[in-house]
Regions:
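Intrinsically disordered, low-complexity proline/glycine-rich segments
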Residues: 1-125
Length: 125
């Protein structure tokens, strides 16, 4: 499906999108994009959105849609996004992988968020 994923939407591992776009919303929830942080319940780490739909762009970043991959400590391809709404869609079903430089920044941010969670001993969910 090409339904757009938003902040707070869940994932196939029981996780959720932690934060998203600062400029675009749908039904008062920010749109998720490549590189945005995602909590993974299975590996207990913060990962990031590793794919986006090139037909829906927000601030020069591809927006994530249902089924796009999350990168975390889980095996590649086992952690996917689940859209919670069925109205806002990208123009077509498509996926591009996050560029290396963007992935490096997202990975660094995810590690910082995981470390902060471990130091605070507070669950993210």
């Amino acid at each position: 499906m090409t339904y757009v994923v938003r902040e707070g939407d869940s994932t196939t591992t029981g996780g959720m999108v932690l934060s998203a776009s600062g400029s675009q919303t749908w039904e008062d929830r920010r749109l998720a994009r490549m590189g945005d942080p995602v909590w993974c319940e299975r590996c207990a780490q913060v990962g990031f959105i590793g794919q986006g739909n090139p037909t829906f762009i927000d601030d020069l970043v591809a927006v994530a849609t249902d089924g796009h991959a999350v990168r975390c400590a889980c095996a590649e391809g086992t952690h996917r996004l689940i859209a919670s709404q069925d109205q806002l869609q990208a123009d077509m079903e498509a996926a591009i992988d996050i560029p290396k430089d963007m992935a490096d920044k997202a990975r660094k941010r995810a590690r910082q968020m995981t470390r902060a969670r471990l130091e605070s001993h507070e669950p993210l969910t």
